[in-house]
Amino acid sequence: MTEYVLLLVGTVLVNNFVLVKFLGLCPFMGVSKKLETAIGMGLATTFVLTLASVCAYLVESYILRPLGIEYLRTMSFILVIAVVVQFTEMVVHKTSPTLYRLLGIFLPLITTNCAVLGVALLNINENHNFIESIIYGFGAAVGFSLVLILFASMRERIAAADVPVPFKGASIAMITAGLMSLAFMGFTGLVK
């Protein structure tokens, strides 16, 4: 049980996919201008990442490895992710049309989010079992959502602040992301 908690804490805080592994930077910078959009994207990504991790583990364990076709891993994981994203898009469209409009093009772009494919591939490379795959996918998703929501909150405050002209826009966003990354480095010794 302790190793599961450590895996969860490690993926959320210590080995955060955005700030440490630099995966998922496109939605991190693109969707983080408004807090409500960031929360919606975080929830959608959490659902997709967790479900894609489980599906990727099952595809690897019950199809690719038994048939000896591991060389099709990346292509099959992309297909699995696309199916999960389409399912998520249908669910969001039916349950929250407002959120669906707010997310716009970013919802289908979860398919190309490198964090989703990265988590699926790292699950296999680190030889996680079924439970560990669920925890790893969920932890990565929670870490992504946490960073996305924190960054969106900061960007909303920065938008209202008096920022010097040369630092407006992407410049101050990158500086803020760097400072967030430094803050998360404080968790480095938490899990070995």
Curated annotation (Swiss-Prot):
Protein location: Cell inner membrane
Cellular component per GO, a single term: plasma membrane
GO biological process: electron transport chain
Pfam families, A to Z: Rnf-Nqr (PF02508)
UniProt membrane topology term: Multi-pass membrane protein
Domain of life according to the entry: Bacteria
EC identifiers of the protein: 7.-.-.-
UniProt entry keywords in alphabetical sequence: Cell inner membrane, Cell membrane, Electron transport, Membrane, Translocase, Transmembrane, Transmembrane helix, Transport
InterPro entries listed in its UniProt record: Ion_transpt_RnfA/RsxA, NqrDE/RnfAE, NqrDE/RnfAE_oxidrdctase
Listed transmembrane segments: 5-25, 39-59, 67-87, 102-122, 134-154, 171-191
Quaternary structure, from the entry: The complex is composed of six subunits: RnfA, RnfB, RnfC, RnfD, RnfE and RnfG.
Family indicated by similarity: Belongs to the NqrDE/RnfAE family.
Protein name according to UniProt: Ion-translocating oxidoreductase complex subunit A
Organism: Vibrio parahaemolyticus serotype O3:K6 (strain RIMD 2210633)
Lineage: Bacteria, Pseudomonadati, Pseudomonadota, Gammaproteobacteria, Vibrionales
